[in-house]
Swiss-Prot record:
Residue positions where Phosphothreonine is found in the record: T55
Residues bearing PTM Phosphoserine: S63
GO cellular component, one term: extracellular region
Organism: Mus musculus
Protein name according to UniProt: BPI fold-containing family B member 2
Length: 462
């Protein structure tokens, strides 16, 4: 599998994507550009060299009175040149130059020679029935150049050298391409990791799959990728807004980036719906009587609401239960993304050794600035407050509530816990489409009208 690692990025090429929308699936558009192929070419030399360490059959030397079996061994396979390019509508063309250092254990003395070989292969990229990518090699050839003798082997006759070369070429001609086929099959296994489940939270997962045949041009390869978000094994389904598929313009983002990933509004909507249904956005804030920084107690609240002071003459902690009954709304505008929450905040008194006593509840609206970033293979978020809280009384067991006075108290005790909770949750991130051990690096996130674009480099880590 080690030899599959680097060329596994070649798959990623396959794994990135323009998406044709299906009704219940969020869509992501990813493109791998020429820079990604250059990276694969660079890190792919080592695994290709290992794959070319093949065994050569013994050479039967007819020069004597009796045929002699002479061992032939590849000492080293060096790949100084490895190049990949896109073939529009097909896949990727591979060309590589390899220099084989070969030792022939002939009598009376062994000889060492260097045999240059050019490898050419066309790799076809397709989608299989389970929604992952599959590679095949319909065309492969080996082109041999004349071998050169290393110093110390100059006494070998030209006739013997010619016979040895013919034997080596005949033996390697099919073996080299067979090992290229094997390398590609290893990559297919690696590509299968694209469709595995990735956790989003303790009870939620995301699963990616390729939804259509890849689109390949001379500049990039793109795939249509669908995402299924699930909670407790059940998919989160949200109707698509409009019938038009998500299309990522070309060109877009950093022209020198290896990968360009487009994330649709629908993906964000489904992710937030899942978090809301899971209860992950809910929180509880408890006051501490001995804390100077937490005025969440009946003594402070009683100064604003007389009935609270009447019911609780002794200082009693307060508890805020925050529940999001409505799905959060993310809005994506050029260079700006916001998150709107509309939680219900229930205020309870928490007398010692007694059940919580409901006081009143508030409908809250809060607008947050949403900052997005990519770390390794995850899209992460952080929030900050935009303006203030908008509060209104939903129900009350303590009579009239003067919101002008309560607003300052609730905002003070509510803001930091809310932001801390959201930032911890969004900071966990959602895994972007990738194969195992492949990470996005040096990523730049741009917000456009109705979608997000990630321009990124790629790094394969063992």
């Amino acid at each position: 599998m080690a030899r599959a690692c680097s060329l596994g990025l070649l798959l990623l090429l396959l794994l990135l994507l323009r998406t044709v929308v299906t009704v219940s699936l969020p869509v992501i558009v990813v493109r791998l550009n020429k820079a990604a192929l250059d990276y694969v070419s660079d890190i792919g030399k080592a695994p290709l060299q290992r794959a070319l360490q093949v065994t050569i059959s013994d050479f039967m030397d007819p020069s004597g009175e009796v045929l002699q079996s002479t061992r032939v061994q590849i000492l080293d396979a060096h790949v100084p040149f490895f190049y990949l390019k896109f073939i529009a509508g097909f896949g990727v063309h591979l060309s590589a130059a390899a220099n084989f250092t070969i030792k022939v254990f002939s009598v009376p003395e062994p000889m060492e020679l260097v045999l240059p070989v050019d490898l050419l292969a066309d790799v076809h990229v397709a989608r299989d029935s389970i929604g992952t990518l599959v590679l095949s090699v319909p065309a492969c050839s080996s082109i041999f150049s004349p071998a050169g003798m290393l110093d110390g082997s100059i006494s070998t006759s030209q006739e013997l050298l010619d016979r040895v070369q013919e034997h080596i070429k005949a033996d390697l001609n099919n073996k080299l391409c067979l090992h290229v086929y094997g390398l590609v099959q290893d990559l297919n296994v690696h590509l299968g990791t694209l469709i595995g489940l990735s956790p989003v939270g303790p009870e939620s997962q995301i699963r990616y799959s390729i939804t259509s045949m890849p689109t390949i041009t001379s500049n990039y390869i793109s795939l249509d990728i669908g995402a299924i978000l699930s909670l407790l094994g059940k998919p989160i389904l949200l109707p698509m807004h409009g019938a038009h598929p998500f299309v990522l313009p070309w060109p877009l983002g950093d022209a020198g980036a290896m990968a360009t990933v487009g994330l649709s509004q629908h993906l964000f909507d489904c992710a937030l719906l899942m978090l809301q249904k899971a209860g992950s956005l809910n929180l509880e804030i408890t006051g501490q009587l001995n804390s100077k920084n937490n005025p969440l107690n009946t003594s402070v609240l009683g100064q604003l609401i007389p009935e609270v002071a009447h019911l609780f003459p002794e200082p009693t902690p307060l508890v805020l239960k925050v529940q999001l009954g409505a799905t959060p709304v993310v809005t994506l505008h050029t260079s700006n993304s916001t998150l709107q929450l509309q939680p219900l905040v229930e205020v309870f008194a928490a007398p010692s050794n007694l059940a919580l006593q409901f006081l009143f509840s508030l409908d809250v609206m809060v607008n947050l600035d949403l900052q997005l970033s990519v770390s390794k293979a995850k899209l992460r978020g952080s929030t900050s407050l935009l303006g203030g809280f908008q509060l209104s009384v939903a129900t009350s067991n303590v009579g009239s509530v003067d919101m002008d006075q309560v607003l300052t108290l609730i905002s003070t005790v509510f803001q930091k816990p809310l932001l801390d909770h959201l930032n911890a949750l969004l900071g966990m991130g959602v895994v972007l489409p990738r194969v195992h051990n492949l990470h996005y690096v040096h990523s730049e996130v741009l917000v456009r009208e109705g979608y997000v674009v990630v321009s990124s480099g790629l790094a394969y880590q063992h």
